[in-house]
């Protein structure tokens, strides 16, 4: 008997569903994989040999490609993963061969503010605990590859300090790279949110010995912000992955020349850590539909997409494939539209914009809800006025999708506490704007509650598609950044601080400047670069304070506002609720 999500936490619902789930071999056979194309990880998870699948099905047409995005979220999240899974379950109930692609959750948010990213209620993916903790080891492999690169860099700096040119050549055949310790492009990574590691000193020599490393300032980023994760997300195949790994710029020499992983002789070994991680993972929804889980970059500080490889494989195996972009349309969908689709060559058939009464109330003027705390009073009573005022944010995000030329569906992700009047107000405003809108109760009712959404998406996929990029990649980097700020965020313009302006000037002078993508780094809690500005801010300019460069990924990342690549852990973290039943070995408290 299915548990009631209004009475039971997600982890209990998942445990109940896991007692009836298919083996991964059964799941793969239903998906159309041959036996040799599946690498089982236990009974219920597996990896897919993507190169074998793509070769076998190279002449098969792709299925319909749908992206799920959202309005500007609250810190509680508005249910994009839940909607992605619910939509796939709804499509399956309509007899359509469907699959989902979601990102692998990071340990930091899982143990911090968010808990698992497996969906929720009756629209989850399972098995929940392995998916949320460790999974098939991909995040560990990404971290190991990244930190191996840093090991090669810092050890090389130590040896060049300790030995003259002749000795370096004699000992290892190394030529001096003359690395500038003040121009190290990256730090180390780990998969937790540790604010204490944002700024550190490494290589402290203690008693003066010269074998304890090169003393310098350094830092840790969260693993999902690593360039290695981004490369894994956009690589089309293993060859593309290897080539990109060799172009990563870890530092500069004293003459300003980039020092790459190839210069350090470590690119091949870094790629070796990723051979298995490059294969998409396969699990299932609680109703038995296939879910591809592959890569996990955040959308505010990185690409925010599951992998190109997973989507390409799934589109050969499914009639409808639903992928998810991180955070809201101005962040995740913009990067899906102008970066992921550029790298993959794929064209979406439809996009879903998820909206909740809760987030609309926030944009209408209600105070920001906080994880782990009771909802403020405006969220616990009916307030149609707040919902109507907040719909300006929804219409802005709908406009972003329309600008891409892709047919859009607004999904009202209904919570069981929402009132009919509040839901009717959203529907009325969307319909007045000419939008296709669907109410979905997938959290509470699973696929049965997503039938209206499934039908709306099916209809949208049959509409005329005029997909087009936002900008020309041949245009200058500053022009592309300004286009994103004005056309997507709604800014009046862009202010480049001197450091950012100089770095953009240097990057624009590269011969491959028109091959570099623009991957914005900005808060996810506002259309602007100030998280407190809700709704649709007016009369503001985007301030770009720095520009990061990722040579392997081929991305330029303008940084706006006060945002860190290493998030912090708050005062009421999720890990306090997580434990293990020592009699059964089952993990409890994941949500």
Curated annotation (Swiss-Prot):
Enzyme Commission number: 6.3.4.3
First-tier enzyme category under EC: ligase
Keywords: ATP-binding, Ligase, Nucleotide-binding, One-carbon metabolism
Swiss-Prot/TrEMBL GO biological process terms: tetrahydrofolate interconversion
Pathway: One-carbon metabolism; tetrahydrofolate interconversion
Record flagged with keyword ATP-binding: yes
Catalysed reactions listed for this entry: (6S)-5,6,7,8-tetrahydrofolate + formate + ATP = (6R)-10-formyltetrahydrofolate + ADP + phosphate
SUPFAM superfamilies tied to this protein: P-loop containing nucleoside triphosphate hydrolases (SSF52540)
Entry annotated with the keyword ATP-binding: yes
GO molecular function: ATP binding; formate-tetrahydrofolate ligase activity
InterPro entries per the UniProt record, alphabetical: Formate_THF_ligase, Formate_THF_ligase_CS, P-loop_NTPase
Entry binding sites for ATP: 74-81
Pfam families referenced in this protein's UniProt entry, alphabetically: FTHFS (PF01268)
Family indicated by similarity: Belongs to the formate--tetrahydrofolate ligase family.
HAMAP family noted in UniProt: FTHFS (MF_01543)
Protein name per its UniProtKB record: Formate--tetrahydrofolate ligase
Gene that produces this protein: fhs
């Amino acid at each position: 008997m299915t548990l009631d999500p209004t009475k039971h936490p997600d982890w209990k619902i998942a445990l109940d569903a896991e007692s009836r789930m298919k083996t991964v071999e059964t799941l793969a056979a239903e998906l159309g994989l041959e036996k040799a194309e599946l690498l089982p990880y236990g009974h219920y998870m597996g990896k897919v040999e993507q190169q074998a699948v793509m070769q076998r099905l190279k002449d098969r047409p792709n299925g319909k490609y749908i992206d799920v995005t959202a309005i500007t979220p609250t810190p509680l999240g508005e249910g994009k993963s839940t909607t992605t899974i619910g939509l796939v379950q709804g499509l399956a109930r309509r007899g359509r061969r469907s699959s989902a692609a979601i990102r692998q959750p990071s340990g930091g948010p899982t143990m911090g503010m968010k808990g698992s990213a497996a969906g929720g209620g009756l629209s989850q993916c399972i098995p929940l605990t392995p998916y949320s903790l460790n999974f098939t080891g991909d995040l560990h492999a990404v971290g190991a590859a990244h930190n191996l690169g840093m090991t090669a860099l810092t050890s090389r700096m130590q040896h060049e300090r300790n030995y003259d040119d002749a000795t370096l050549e004699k000992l290892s055949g190394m030529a001096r790279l003359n690395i500038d310790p003040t121009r190290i492009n990256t730090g180390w990574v780990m998969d937790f949110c540790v604010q204490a590691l944002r700024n550190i000193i490494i290589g402290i020599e203690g008693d003066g010995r010269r074998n304890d490393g090169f003393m310098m300032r350094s830092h840790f980023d969260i693993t999902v912000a690593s360039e290695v994760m981004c490369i894994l997300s956009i690589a089309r195949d293993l060859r593309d992955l290897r080539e990109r790994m060799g172009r990563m710029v870890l530092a500069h020499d004293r003459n300003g020349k980039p020092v790459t992983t190839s210069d350090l002789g470590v690119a091949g070994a870094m790629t070796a850590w990723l051979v298995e991680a490059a294969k998409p993972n396969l699990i299932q929804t609680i109703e038995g539909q296939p879910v591809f889980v592959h890569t996990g970059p955040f959308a505010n500080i990185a690409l925010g997409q599951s992998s190109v490889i997973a989507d390409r494989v799934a589109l050969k195996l499914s009639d409808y494939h639903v992928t998810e972009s991180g955070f809201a349309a101005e962040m995740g969908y913009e990067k899906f539209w102008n970066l992921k689709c550029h790298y993959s060559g794929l064209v979406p058939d439809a996009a879903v914009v998820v909206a909740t009464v809760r987030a609309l109330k926030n944009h209408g003027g209600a105070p920001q809800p906080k994880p782990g705390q009771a909802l403020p009073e405006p969220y616990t009573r009916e307030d149609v006025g707040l919902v109507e005022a907040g719909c300006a944010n929804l219409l802005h995000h709908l406009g972003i999708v329309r600008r891409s030329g892709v047919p859009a569906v607004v999904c009202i992700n209904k919570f069981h506490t929402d009132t009919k009047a509040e839901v009717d107000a959203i529907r009325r405003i969307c319909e007045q704007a000419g939008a296709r809108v669907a109410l979905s109760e997938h959290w509470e009712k699973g696929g049965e509650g997503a039938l209206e959404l499934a039908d709306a998406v099916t209809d949208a996929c049959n509409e005329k598609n005029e997909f087009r990029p936002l900008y020309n990649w041949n245009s200058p980097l500053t022009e592309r950044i300004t286009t994103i700020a004005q056309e997507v965020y709604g800014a009046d313009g862009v202010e480049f601080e001197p450091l950012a302006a100089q770095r953009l000037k240097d990057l624009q002078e590269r011969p491959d400047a028109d091959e570099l993508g623009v991957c914005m780094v900005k808060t996810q809690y506002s259309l602007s670069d100030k998280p407190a500005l809700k709704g649709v801010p007016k009369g503001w300019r985007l301030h770009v304070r720095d520009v990061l460069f990722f040579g392997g990924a081929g991305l330029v990342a303008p940084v706006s506002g006060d945002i860190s690549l290493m998030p912090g852990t708050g005062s009421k973290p999720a890990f306090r609720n997580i434990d293990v039943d020592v009699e059964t070995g089952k993990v409890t408290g994941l949500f």
